[in-house]
């Protein structure tokens, strides 16, 4: 199932055997997730990320560096050759479901019923259906019907 291991040489893992903890160690701070969100929405240049998030330059520089080191983003020379662009790697693109699930959770729990918010739509302008995990037979699963198998 794993495609590529993150470039995380020298990292100290919060919980080495837990995929959730490792993912959060790699991308879990607020600014990194917002940068990933914006990269998925077309941000490429340093100034794109800065304007969209309002992040301070020094923090943005640090987060972009970390995301590159960890294999989430890569730096590419812009077509003009005058600046660097930041684009998602395959590992970064694989975070799409995480961003969508986070967005959908926020739509349900972080806004008042009549409060307006942005909406993620498909190519035809239709809002995405709610993400729901299923088992191997396609049946819905949730916290009550799953468990974690701890490898020994």
Language-model regions, residue ranges each:
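C-terminal regulatory/oligomerization modules of transcriptional regulators
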Residues: 1-4, 100, 104-152
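N-terminal helix-turn-helix DNA-binding core of bacterial DNA-binding proteins
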Residues: 16-56
